[in-house]
Amino acid sequence: INIGFIGAGAVGCSIGKYLCENSSIAKIKGYYSRTSKSVDIAATFTNSKAYASPEELVNECDVICITTPDDIILKVWEQIKNYNLQQKIICHFSGSLSSDIFSGIEETKAEKISIHPMYAFSDKFTSYRQLNTARLTMEGSSKAVKVMQELFGDELHHKIFMLKASDKVKYHAAAAFASNYVVGIFDVALGLLKDCGFTDEDAVSLLGPLTMGNVKSVIENGTLEALTGPVIRNDTGTV
C-alpha cells in the first residue's frame, strides 16, 4: 500500500515513521505541506519523498492521509477532490471530525475513513516509539475500513474500536477530559501550592505520587472505588 501524507507535523511524522519501521504492507511514499522546511524534515525522517504539490502526491499514492490541523482538513479535501481519486482511500486522523467531512467523495470513486489513535503525540521525532501501545478508533466506508484494519489490526496488532460518525464529537470530548483537562487541573493544583510558598519542583514532587496513584487506582478499580479523602468520608464541612 503506497501511503502519502498531506501535513508534516507530529501526527504525520509519527505515523509515517512507525509504519516505516514496523509494516511490510505499507510503503511511505512521502509528504506534502505548505511549508517546504517541514516537508523536507518529514521526508528525511522517514526516508521518503518531499512532494512539491499535493496532486503529485495523490497520483503516486493509494492512501492519502490528511494529517493537518482539524480546521484545515476541509480545505485540503476541497483541493484534492478535483484530482483523480478513483479507487484511492482518503483518510484523516482527527478525533472530533468524522469521515463525512469528505463530502461528495462518492462522485470521485474514492473511499473514506477517519482513524484516531488514542495517544498523545507530544514529540515529532520520538512519539512513534510507543505508538504500538495505542488503541485505535475507525469509522468510514466498508472498503476503506477493511484495508486499514488489515494494516493496523491484522499486521500491527492494534486493538481497534469501530465508531459511528455521529459519535465522534462525544468521543473526542471523552479524550479531552482524560488528557488535556487533567493537565489543566494539575496546573491549577500546582498554582495553589505555589501560593502556599512551594517551589515548582517541590509542588510537582508533592502532587506527582498522589496523581499517579489516583490514575492507577481508576484504571484498576474504577472511578467509584478510586475516590478517597473527604468525599468518600462524607466530610461535608471540608468539601
Where are these regions (language model features)?
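Nucleotide donor/acceptor-binding cores
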Residues: 1, 88, 134
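Interdomain hinge/lid region at the active-site interface
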Residues: 214-239
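NAD(P)+-binding Rossmann beta1-loop-alpha1 motif at the extreme N-terminus of oxidoreductases
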Residues: 1-56
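Rossmann-like NAD(P)(H) cofactor-binding subdomain of soluble oxidoreductases
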Residues: 46-126
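Short, hydrophobic beta-strand segments that form beta-sheet elements in well-ordered domains
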Residues: 28-33, 90-93, 136-139
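Short, well-ordered alpha-helical microsegments
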Residues: 39, 73-74, 98-102, 145-146, ...
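Internal alpha-helical scaffold of NAD(P)-dependent oxidoreductase catalytic cores
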Residues: 38-45, 107-109, 126-219
